[in-house]
Amino acid sequence: MKVVVLGAGVIGVTTAWYLAKAGHEVVVLERQDGAALETSFANAGEISPGYASPWASPGVPRKAPKWLLARHAPLIVRPSLDPALLSWLLAMLRNCTTERYLANKARMVRLAEHSRDCLIALRRETGIQYDQRSRGTLQVFRTQAQMDEAGKDMEVLRDLGVPYELLDRLGCIAREPGLGHARDTIVGGLRLPNDETGDCFKFTTALADLCRGQGVDFRFGTTIQGLETAGGEVGGVRTPGGTVTGDAYVVCLGSYSEPFLRPHGIRTGVYPVKGYSLTATITDEAKAPVSTLLDETYKVAITRLGDRVRIGGLAELAGYDLSLRPSRRATLEHSAGSLFGGSCDLPSATFWCGLRPMTPTSTPRIGEAPLRRLFLNTGHGTLGWTMACGSAQVLADAVGRQAPALDLTDYAVPGSPAAEPLRRAA
């Protein structure tokens, strides 16, 4: 079967890999001049299945007003009358119940755990290199209230069989010695020993090279203009160079999936959430992080990537704006400086931003679309790197009409056959 994949971020390239390994002929269309040059370029670098949590949680309605007024707020909503933003915010608030939070988190963790298993298998098969470390992830709490709120997450982790360690202040420092000078800043932490770190850009570009060895045809610098449809099915993809045809089509366009599909009546619920990162060179090994640390207060991840530190996170609802705001840089520097002060060259760090494709439930859209021969693999939010391999593997199964490793009704595209059980249960 010939499959046309739209997009060459980490989701598109992993999708191409698993489709090619399943024996399909694969063509990848990408507007940039190479793989992983947009949202996958400089993300936080963490692969953290256990920390896969919905943004829509019971505490958000209470915390959001305080965040909006805080100097170093983890969330900023730029004033807008955009109907898509207002609809997305209302849908997210509807998911801020304990029942929906726990259900969505369980779906996310299941997919993320499966994805890590797929990544480990891929690494063993190929020997792919991407500054990978398997040293766990530590979520640090600056207040006792944050520590107490971790209880509901630990309950889900227990139910799903995910190992974890609840640590006091000294336990955190034992795992991350660089926190020694910040002992009065933290009260404790939650550590997941099975989590990993790695450079998503290096992984994606290396996997694209491996894909070529499997016969995948990458067509970089190709503008995707739209889908050609007739009789309820997709017949091709319009590009300036003509129509690209196949037997199946997979949309991996991240935050651009929603406007791309809207003319065909397909609503993914995906909205762009801007995140920022700094990439800094390590100047003092003893003060640097060993693996990934999550700063619960500022929603920032601080990750060791070889001889660099990646500081990433925050959330800004501002549509498709990609401007770099100095105030966001200041927040990243404040988080990293207060925990790993003197570890890296923050003033010379590279400042970057990207658009995460977020759904109101934080669960991605994977599987068949309402149009025949069309599939989606999008909406992974902040967890595209964590969920990439598993999402691609189950998507490849769906395209090939094989029984997937996970129940795809949990990630169904609205209006698709797989979404029917969810609609009836709603």
From Swiss-Prot:
State one Pfam family annotation.
DAO
Provide the binding site for FAD. Answer: 3-17
- Which GO MF term does the entry hold, naming one? D-amino-acid dehydrogenase activity
Q: What is its EC number?
A: 1.4.99.-
The cofactors it requires, by name, are: FAD
* Protein keywords: FAD, Flavoprotein, Oxidoreductase
Pathway linked to the protein: Amino-acid degradation; D-alanine degradation; NH(3) and pyruvate from D-alanine: step 1/1
Protein's job: Oxidative deamination of D-amino acids.
Q: Which PANTHER family match?
A: D-AMINO ACID DEHYDROGENASE, SARCOSINE DEHYDROGENASE-RELATED
Q: What is this protein called?
A: D-amino acid dehydrogenase
Q: Give the organism, scientific name.
A: Phenylobacterium zucineum (strain HLK1)
